Amino acid sequence: MSALTIYSDKDASQPQWHSTDAAEIAQQLNAKGVRFERWVADRDLGQAPAPETVITAYQHAIDKLVAEKGYQSWDVISLRADNPQKEALRAKFLNEHTHGEDEVRFFVEGAGLFCLHIGDQVYQVLCEKNDLISVPAGTPHWFDMGSEPNFTAIRIFDNPEGWVAQFTGDAIADAYPRLL
């Protein structure tokens, strides 16, 4: 179930707000310029689908985003618990970073935790299958795939080079709850 938990960026011990209601989540995030919507991820992708299979199955969703914002490229990230690089990938994404473009993800399987450092608050957004999130360019954030990752998401980019991060060097992510 999708969820949003908001913390002070000075105190990770006590949430200020929490909801699993998609409309409430969208309202809170939209007020900060973050797009959050529930889309439909209902295609049967089979076991361990190839990226091309995922792209073909959801080309209509990609086309919608391209028409809206003029995005130039897309790919698929899919990680499972048996991936030998899961620990290194998790560590990389857990470092707070920004992008020079929006970070757009459409979750078609599984779940992951986006953590957004906006002003003096941290917004932890548990995204799951059917969730579309677009984090505005320049927003400090990190992503937690969990110790046993299980997700497939379509990534949409302005930059034809794909995922390019600028790490902030802030260790804030270490203080906040992680996805198990």
Swiss-Prot record:
<feature type="binding site">
    <location>
        <position position="103"/>
    </location>
    <ligand>
        <name>Fe(2+)</name>
    </ligand>
</feature>
<feature type="site" description="May play a role in metal incorporation in vivo">
    <location>
        <position position="96"/>
    </location>
</feature>
<dbReference type="GO" id="GO:0019509">
    <property type="term" value="P:L-methionine salvage from methylthioadenosine"/>
</dbReference>
<dbReference type="GO" id="GO:0016151">
    <property type="term" value="F:nickel cation binding"/>
</dbReference>
<feature type="binding site">
    <location>
        <position position="141"/>
    </location>
    <ligand>
        <name>Ni(2+)</name>
    </ligand>
</feature>
<keyword id="KW-0533">Nickel</keyword>
<dbReference type="InterPro" id="IPR004313">
    <property type="entry name" value="ARD"/>
</dbReference>
<dbReference type="GO" id="GO:0010309">
    <property type="term" value="F:acireductone dioxygenase [iron(II)-requiring] activity"/>
</dbReference>
<dbReference type="InterPro" id="IPR011051">
    <property type="entry name" value="RmlC_Cupin_sf"/>
</dbReference>
<keyword id="KW-0408">Iron</keyword>
<keyword id="KW-0028">Amino-acid biosynthesis</keyword>
<dbReference type="GO" id="GO:0019284">
    <property type="term" value="P:L-methionine salvage from S-adenosylmethionine"/>
</dbReference>
<feature type="binding site">
    <location>
        <position position="103"/>
    </location>
    <ligand>
        <name>Ni(2+)</name>
    </ligand>
</feature>
<feature type="binding site">
    <location>
        <position position="97"/>
    </location>
    <ligand>
        <name>Ni(2+)</name>
    </ligand>
</feature>
<feature type="binding site">
    <location>
        <position position="141"/>
    </location>
    <ligand>
        <name>Fe(2+)</name>
    </ligand>
</feature>
<keyword id="KW-0479">Metal-binding</keyword>
<keyword id="KW-0560">Oxidoreductase</keyword>
<comment type="pathway">
    <text>Amino-acid biosynthesis; L-methionine biosynthesis via salvage pathway; L-methionine from S-methyl-5-thio-alpha-D-ribose 1-phosphate: step 5/6.</text>
</comment>
<comment type="subunit">
    <text>Monomer.</text>
</comment>
<dbReference type="GO" id="GO:0005506">
    <property type="term" value="F:iron ion binding"/>
</dbReference>
<protein>
    <recommendedName>
        <fullName>Acireductone dioxygenase</fullName>
        <ecNumber>1.13.11.54</ecNumber>
        <ecNumber>1.13.11.53</ecNumber>
    </recommendedName>
</protein>
<feature type="site" description="May play a role in transmitting local conformational changes">
    <location>
        <position position="102"/>
    </location>
</feature>
<dbReference type="InterPro" id="IPR014710">
    <property type="entry name" value="RmlC-like_jellyroll"/>
</dbReference>
<dbReference type="Pfam" id="PF03079">
    <property type="entry name" value="ARD"/>
</dbReference>
<feature type="binding site">
    <location>
        <position position="99"/>
    </location>
    <ligand>
        <name>Ni(2+)</name>
    </ligand>
</feature>
<keyword id="KW-0486">Methionine biosynthesis</keyword>
<feature type="binding site">
    <location>
        <position position="97"/>
    </location>
    <ligand>
        <name>Fe(2+)</name>
    </ligand>
</feature>
<feature type="binding site">
    <location>
        <position position="99"/>
    </location>
    <ligand>
        <name>Fe(2+)</name>
    </ligand>
</feature>
<dbReference type="GO" id="GO:0010308">
    <property type="term" value="F:acireductone dioxygenase (Ni2+-requiring) activity"/>
</dbReference>
<comment type="function">
    <text>Catalyzes 2 different reactions between oxygen and the acireductone 1,2-dihydroxy-3-keto-5-methylthiopentene (DHK-MTPene) depending upon the metal bound in the active site. Fe-containing acireductone dioxygenase (Fe-ARD) produces formate and 2-keto-4-methylthiobutyrate (KMTB), the alpha-ketoacid precursor of methionine in the methionine recycle pathway. Ni-containing acireductone dioxygenase (Ni-ARD) produces methylthiopropionate, carbon monoxide and formate, and does not lie on the methionine recycle pathway.</text>
</comment>
<dbReference type="InterPro" id="IPR023956">
    <property type="entry name" value="ARD_bac"/>
</dbReference>
<feature type="site" description="Important to generate the dianion">
    <location>
        <position position="105"/>
    </location>
</feature>
<comment type="similarity">
    <text>Belongs to the acireductone dioxygenase (ARD) family.</text>
</comment>
<keyword id="KW-0223">Dioxygenase</keyword>
